[in-house]
């Protein structure tokens, strides 16, 4: 498990070793440059997690007969946003597993029996649709019935206060991430 601090150290000892922001290869990124480098790390992670399915999560959606478009946003979650002013909190998250606004793309949808529903198939009566990346459209919703949505998820955004947090990336992609950060720093 590689932490953000380790990624910064690796950058300072390799791709960024010959520039001022890396303490000239002494094993760290100077404090005033960390926010900029971490911004590039976040951009690189978002690009990789968007192009390759590196994280999947699922969420339960409770249907209401008058709602056809279900926006996968935390303001519609039961626990993620306790102060929500939304009248219908249809995302059924849990207190210890709150929904995060991390949807890249909806991948699969399952009904309450576990059967996979057709996705974006106009030829199927029970098909559900994705008019936007984080919107599930259910043409014929049934109040109280839940569907499970499997989606491609983003990497959590990292900050300068997250140096001990794990960068959730397969080992083989860290070199790609470092190369992307170097490209952004030098361009």
Outline where the language-model segments fall:
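Glycine-enriched, solvent-exposed interface loops adjoining structured elements
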Residues: 1-187
């Amino acid at each position: 498990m590689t932490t953000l601090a380790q990624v910064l150290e690796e950058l300072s000892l390799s791709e960024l070793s010959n520039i001022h922001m890396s303490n000239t290869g002494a094993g760290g990124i100077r404090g005033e440059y960390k926010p900029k480098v971490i911004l590039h790390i976040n951009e690189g992670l978002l690009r990789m997690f968007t192009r390759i399915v590196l994280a999947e999560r699922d969420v339960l959606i409770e249907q209401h007969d008058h709602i056809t478009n279900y926006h996968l946003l935390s303001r519609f979650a039961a626990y993620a946003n306790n102060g929500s002013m939304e009248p219908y909190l249809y995302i059924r998250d849990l207190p210890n597993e709150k929904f995060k606004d991390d949807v890249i793309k909806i991948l699969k949808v399952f009904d309450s029996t576990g059967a996979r529903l057709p996705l974006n198939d106009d030829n199927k009566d029970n098909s559900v649709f994705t008019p936007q990346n984080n919107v599930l459209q259910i043409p014929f919703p049934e109040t109280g019935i839940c569907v499970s949505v499997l989606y491609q998820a983003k990497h959590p955004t990292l900050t300068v206060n997250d140096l001990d947090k794990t960068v959730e990336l397969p080992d083989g992609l860290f070199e790609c991430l470092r190369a992307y950060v170097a490209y952004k720093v030098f361009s």
